[in-house]
Amino acid sequence: MQHLNIHGHTLTLRRFPHKPGCPLQAWDAADALALTNHALPDGEILILNDHFGALACGLAYPERTLEWVNDSYMAHQALAQNLQLNRIETPLHRTPALAASPTNPVGILIKLPRMLQLLSSQLDWLNLHLPKGTPVVIAARQKDMPSTLPDLTRRLLDDVHPSRAEKKARLIFGQLSGRQSGQAEITAWHCAELDCLLSHYPNVFGRQKLDLGARVLLQNLGTIPDQVVDLGCGNGVLSIAALQRNPNSHVLAVDESWQATRSCQINLERVRTPEHFKVVWGHSLSFIEGMQADLVLCNPPFHQHQTLTDDIAWCMFKDAHRVLKPGGRLRMVGNRHLGYHAKLHKLFGHCRSIAATPKFVVLESVKSS
């Protein structure tokens, strides 16, 4: 466990999933700067994209209500974990997506998301539903701030001014303007490889083209059995391909991004009736019993928010091994340099290469009988 000191108060914070001995912190310099310099008045605060609940824990006190919105299922788990660790009982309403509230917040605190389209979409919603002039504070590490961020904030906020940098982090102050970006909430494009229309919410990768890793795995799916899991489904391209290749299959599509699962649901409904698939918002496969799947397809992430890590991939591999029937297969794609073959060999006892490109490798392991 690690400790963050804010105004003489010490918070105990953990990342999620928790990995004992992991040196990575559950907060960064932008979180600490926001908690000490946000300058928002007393009253209800709306918090967006708080990775592990550090902002919520730091702003919590009995007289304040917090509205907390995060697309990430793991962020919700991290928040619950850290509220409990710090014995915080502040009134707090949690949702995966922005929704109308009976009261208006006195201010909005936004942790800069990895996808700038998500920030634009969030500011559009806030400008549409909350009063003009509501204070907004955006917190980010300088290395995470793209060159297009100043233009975006000036277009959608009034009175925009950045703070001085502290420990390589910065705050951007502004006020809701009532203006809109003109960006569609859901974008759609025709995927030639699947011959179907794909729709995407802003926080989903592959908004106008196939993810390169998914493209390689699509070309090397192999035989599709009856019970398939698409682990980390994203927009659902692997699920769609599985259903197209075996009309009798049933696909369980899982992702920790709420917007990914909503995108996947829309896309699957275009190709099959609901009895052939189920889409779940969750962390890996922790919610299902073992020995149910014939095949797990996986294109695992190698980052959590802005941090490079293989912890999530390892969790996915362990869950895949647990839920596969004896003789069931895990087929996955990953960057060659990540060395996933060693992890699969350790877990399954073997691993074989199905295909490789200069950047990606498709690997398969079979659960022993």
UniProtKB/Swiss-Prot annotation:
Task of the protein: Specifically methylates the guanine in position 1835 (m2G1835) of 23S rRNA.
Organism (species): Magnetococcus marinus (strain ATCC BAA-1437 / JCM 17883 / MC-1)
Reaction it catalyzes: guanosine(1835) in 23S rRNA + S-adenosyl-L-methionine = N(2)-methylguanosine(1835) in 23S rRNA + S-adenosyl-L-homocysteine + H(+)
Protein name as annotated: Ribosomal RNA large subunit methyltransferase G
Highest taxon above the source species: Bacteria
CDD domains found in the cross-reference section: AdoMet_MTases
UniProt keyword annotations, A-Z: Cytoplasm, Methyltransferase, rRNA processing, S-adenosyl-L-methionine, Transferase
Family matches, as InterPro entries: DNA_methylase_N6_adenine_CS, rRNA_m2G-MeTrfase_RlmG, RsmC/RlmG, SAM-dependent_MTases_sf, Small_mtfrase_dom
EC number, UniProt record: 2.1.1.174
Major subcellular site: cytoplasm
GO molecular-function term, one example from the UniProt record: 23S rRNA (guanine(1835)-N(2))-methyltransferase activity
Gene Ontology terms: cellular component: cytoplasm
Gene that produces this protein: rlmG
Protein family (similarity comment): Belongs to the methyltransferase superfamily. RlmG family.
Subcellular location: Cytoplasm
